[in-house]
Amino acid sequence: MDLEKIYKDAGAYLEGHFLLSSGNHSQFYLQSAKVLEDPALAGKLADELAAVIEKFGIKFDSVCSPALGGILAGYELARAAKKRFIFTERVEKVMSLRRGFEVKKGEKFIVCEDIITTGGSALEAAHVIESLGGEVVGFAALANRGFCKVANLGNDSKPNAKLPSDKPFFALGNFEFEIYEPEHCPLCKSGSKAIKPGSRGN
């Protein structure tokens, strides 16, 4: 599966000067919503991701995603794997479980995102699950932005990767984009201003 081509064909592989949620800057941004707006394509990607997880023998009961970006990817993964789906969301900047969702003691979860960069949001969701007695047995995403080690792709992790090394992480593709701290961003130094994805229709 050529994930890069899928993103480009969907108009989801953006080039410019972007302000990421981490506060860092990048010349490239993956707008997964453009890929997932096609239910047939979203289903195909989720089926592929579920097959990868099954191949590695990971047993799980449910899927959890951090809102907002991970919800569509996580829901589709749960559908493909025939599992329950829930999501966490930030309340006053604290990742929380709301809307009547419950976690059973010992319930095994895959935490799923659309894109994982350092894995910070996915890790926050995992901590919520574990604090309620659940067990996170792995992480998944459509794509990895090159920082975290992907079990099925064989790449190495980078120092700022936040996902735990003792839990497998699965993805359909790996995008190695340069990410810059604002004070060291060459795009800023050239006079360009970073925009937050979505602020200008992206």
From Swiss-Prot:
This is Orotate phosphoribosyltransferase. GO terms for molecular function: magnesium ion binding; orotate phosphoribosyltransferase activity. Belongs to the purine/pyrimidine phosphoribosyltransferase family. PyrE subfamily. Pathway: Pyrimidine metabolism; UMP biosynthesis via de novo pathway; UMP from orotate: step 1/2. InterPro entries: OPRT (IPR023031), Orotate_PRibTrfase_bac (IPR006273), PRibTrfase_dom (IPR000836), PRTase-like (IPR029057). It catalyses: orotidine 5'-phosphate + diphosphate = orotate + 5-phospho-alpha-D-ribose 1-diphosphate. Coiled coil: none annotated. Keywords: Glycosyltransferase, Magnesium, Pyrimidine biosynthesis, Transferase. It holds the Pfam family Pribosyltran. It is an enzyme of class 2 (transferase). Homodimer. One of its GO terms (biological process) is pyrimidine nucleobase biosynthetic process. It comes from Campylobacter concisus (strain 13826). The gene is pyrE. Orotate binds at residues 117, 145. PROSITE patterns: PUR_PYR_PR_TRANSFER. Catalyzes the transfer of a ribosyl phosphate group from 5-phosphoribose 1-diphosphate to orotate, leading to the formation of orotidine monophosphate (OMP). 5-phospho-alpha-D-ribose 1-diphosphate binds at residues 93, 113-121. Its EC number is 2.4.2.10. Its cofactor is Mg(2+).
